[in-house]
Regions:
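A non-catalytic alpha/beta surface segment that caps or lines the substrate-entry region
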Residues: 1-31
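Stable alpha-helical elements in mature extracytoplasmic
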Residues: 27, 39, 64-70, 74, ...
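Alpha-helical metal-binding/catalytic segments enriched in His/Glu/Asp
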Residues: 27-29, 43-101, 224
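His/Asp/Glu-rich mid-to-C-terminal helical/loop segments that flank catalytic regions of hydrolases
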Residues: 199-250
Length: 250
């Protein structure tokens, strides 16, 4: 899914410059739902990072190889026949998140499916660290119906899953515009963002595999899968719509 989008200027100087558009390629795949619904759950996890700075490679193990790996683990889980979801899951791996969310902007500017079928966005960005043992679900402030779902999953999750960083607490940063889910939010598509708090290796060349606690990461992946399945099960209730009718057998 190639895209070309305008650069968003950060100040008046940049706004006055003529700059070429940002170009990139999003990667897209899908797992078909079983219920025949045209409502699609879009899972996003950006695959780009900041690249090379001053001759040093920034590998981005947490930001965001961890999110990509989580999305792939979810896709693998749902692709097994016994785990087939009710709704179709569209897996989008945006390019250019580190450059003005350009991949997500390009996806919604030219989606492969009608925008009105994109019912929900679940975004994975930085799930490997949780140095304090906490995984955050950001978005319930904008969709209060998500809070009981998060609490329900948290009660069974293998990690300390918490709701916040979405404008609900003035003492916390607001992550609503901090990753690809922001583009869905601006297009009135409900979202939930799973991620961890910043850590000393964030956007540093030390964000490497060796600094990831594997046990914590795997527990975060398991929790993310639980969240995705809960959204699939409860999507109509979250959206205030009638429940899906059970598919009839021919």
């Amino acid at each position: 899914h190639p895209f070309s989008v305008p650069i968003i200027p950060r100040n008046q100087e940049e706004a006055a410059e003529e700059r070429p558009p940002l170009e990139g390629v999003n990667l897209i795949g899908a797992v078909q739902g079983s219920a025949g619904s045209d409502r699609i759950i879009v899972v996003t996890a950006h695959y780009d990072h900041v690249g090379i700075r001053d001759g040093e490679i920034y590998n981005g193990a947490d930001d965001n190889a961890s999110g990509v790996a989580t999305a792939l683990a979810l896709a693998q889980h749902l692709s097994r026949s016994r785990n087939q979801p009710k709704h179709t899951f569209l897996f989008v791996f945006p390019d250019g998140e580190e450059h003005g969310l350009s991949g997500a902007r390009g996806f919604l500017a030219d989606p492969p499916l009608p925008v009105d079928t994109l019912a929900f966005n679940l975004n994975f960005d930085m799930l490997a660290r949780a140095d304090n043992g906490q995984l955050w679900a950001s978005g319930a402030h904008h969709m209060p119906a998500l809070l009981p779902l998060i609490e329900e999953v948290a009660a069974e999750a293998p990690i300390d899953l918490r709701s916040g960083y979405d404008g609900s607490d003035e003492a916390q940063d607001d992550w609503t515009t901090q990753s690809d889910h922001a583009v869905f939010y601006r297009n009135q598509i409900p979202h939930l963002y799973l991620g961890v708090e910043d850590h000393p290796d964030y956007h540093q060349p030390t964000d490497d595999f060796e600094n990831i606690d594997q046990d914590t990461f795997l527990r975060n992946v398991d929790t993310a899968i639980m969240v995705a399945k809960a959204i699939d099960d409860q999507l109509e209730a979250l959206l205030g719509l009638p429940p899906l009718e059970a598919p009839t057998e021919n």
